[in-house]
Amino acid sequence: MITGQTLRDAILSGANNIANQRVRVDELNVFPVPDGDTGTNMSMTIGAARGELEALPDTCTVAEASKTAASAMLRGARGNSGVITSLLFRGFSKALKGKDEASAEDLANALKMGVEAAYKAVMKPTEGTILTVSRLAAEKAAECTEMEIPAMWDATLAAGQAALEDTPNLLPVLKKAGVVDAGGQGIMII
């Protein structure tokens, strides 16, 4: 089971990871607009939750940690990638509502609901982006709910990484530029 403290700390770790690698992600940014700000926007979005998450007690529930993060990210979302990131967390949070701890099945369902929220909110979902990476990772998580959570998470991350590496085959602008999707890379870093 994952506790609220573990989830809180994992989200904070993700915020640190993207903050430290935002320039690298910015450099990948060629879709939908090559404005070089995907890493910055994702970092600012998840970073908007930092203070509120740090204020949560170690006894917080997964429901409290996820709702706190999702609410702050929604308020602080920047750019397309930031909005999609906040929606992934919003759906994730809704799936954990009322839960003290999360099982592997709970986490897989939360990832699925996050992906559904993001796809529903995007007018024209494009494959080969953060959406694809998130969806394929969530699908793998759903296949692995009988595993211990660390093993499930490793399999989920491996599926997300494989999906990320395939993004140039799905989106010609990425292949032409010789890069993977910036938003997909950002979500894998988080």
Feature map (PLM): residue ranges:
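N-terminal loops that bind phosphate or other acidic moieties
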Residues: 1-190
